[in-house]
Amino acid sequence: MKNIKIITGHYGSGKTNFSVNLAVKAAAEGKSAAIVDLDIVNPYFRTADFKDLFEEKGIRLIAPDFARSNLDIPSIQFDVVELAMDEDCLIIDVGGDDAGAVALGRYAEALEQFRDNIEMYYVINQRRYLTNTAEEVTKLMYEIETAARMKHTAIVNNTNLGVETSLEIIEESRSFAEETSRLTGLPVIYTVYPEDIAPLSDKQDVFPAKIYVKPVWG
């Protein structure tokens, strides 16, 4: 199993919630885990907001100094080589769209030596603005890759409507995810289900997720 997982996606795709779940899952399996908050674009949904959770689970957090405020964010500094060597599972949560992926691009050269040990997941949500079709999410994916100077390896279907998410909504999104897979040539590695809905599906790619990230207006 490759131990470096890079998570990208459109704003509101749910990539941060997925990243948090990946880290918690790794820790529950007895692995040493670290999560890098590279989201220096969106002040509302950041992995750094879950510092207490990570401390409880023994997960190492690397984040910008002001990641828990609404201030402009300075560039984040971390030793990606050291983290990759020290941790069983290293998760890098990248900012939304190509603008957020620019920060990842700064580490592309350092990450190159771990190329065979990296999985780069593209998180998609059909129920979000500007990502309703496979063509739209495919175009955005290539823009992210250009900014990041790295290529994705798989797709994560995280289609949801927040608290209104149902089994039907997720199952209906499978054709959208499959078409995205066809256009990009990448496999759909996971389909994310809220943990209370996950047992209702008989599919093989189910990823049960707890909802950690909630809207600031909720």
Spans of model-derived segments:
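N-terminal phosphate/diphosphate-binding loop that engages ATP/GTP or pyrophosphate donors
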Residues: 25-73, 79
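Loop/turn-to-beta-strand initiation segments
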Residues: 86-90, 118-119
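Switch II (G3) loop of P-loop NTPases
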Residues: 64-69, 88-104
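Walker A (P-loop) phosphate-binding loop of P-loop NTPases
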Residues: 12
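Conserved catalytic-core segment of NTP-binding enzymes
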Residues: 99-203, 216
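Hydrophobic anchor at the beta1->P-loop junction of P-loop NTPases
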Residues: 7
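Hydrophobic positions on the alpha1 helix immediately C-terminal to the Walker A/P-loop
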Residues: 18, 22
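Conserved lysine of the Walker
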Residues: 15
